[in-house]
Amino acid sequence: FSSVPIINAGDGAGQHPSQTLLDLYTIRQSMPLEGIKVGLLGDLRYGRTAHSLAYALSLYHATLYTLSPKGLELPCAITEELTEGGTAIIEHDDVSTIIRDLDVLYVTRIQRERFPDSASYFRVASSYRITPELLSGVKERLIVLHPLPRLDEIDPAQLDAAPPPAVHRHRHAAPVP
């Protein structure tokens, strides 16, 4: 037994709602959740944190911009369910074309274990990276979130440059395994 409350939820590879609670809390510390514009970038097919966050943000009428390598898009079942419920989901293939409009950029890693070989993984993993140059000219209050573990998706120089934009590393707010 534990002397502190424990929240444990999820279904393995599909959802990670306890991480979403932390993400919503982090965003809410900086801005209201209602109607925000959120970019979901990375492995949206297998990234269970992105699945849960998309569902949660739909409750706040957020506009979701999805950006992922081919084959790692947000699952159709999630996209269909959310759009049928009124959530605006806009697919993009270039983060630089929309980043200035975003309130939040949620970056997930490309999961190496999902690829048959290293060459395939590196080809996809190198398709995007958050750099200081990419973030120049964004909203002053843009929040960049990453659920961890972080690989090379965010240039370490960007972490040193924060804020602005505020790059939140969840390890400061009790990470969720």
Residue ranges and their predicted role:
Residues 158-177:
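C-terminal helix-to-coil terminal segments
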Residues 15-21, 75-77, 175-177:
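Short, charged, surface-exposed secondary-structure boundary motifs
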Residues 5, 63, 141-143:
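Proline-centered loop/turn at the N-terminus of a beta-strand
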Residues 1-28, 151-154:
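Phosphate/diphosphate ligand-binding glycine-rich loop within oxidoreductases
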Residues 10-14, 69-71, 169-174:
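Short, acidic/turn-prone active-site loops that include or flank metal/cofactor-
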Residues 82-159, 164:
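Rossmann-like adenosine-cofactor binding region
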Residues 29-107:
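Glycine-rich phosphate/diphosphate-binding loop of Rossmann-like nucleotide-binding domains
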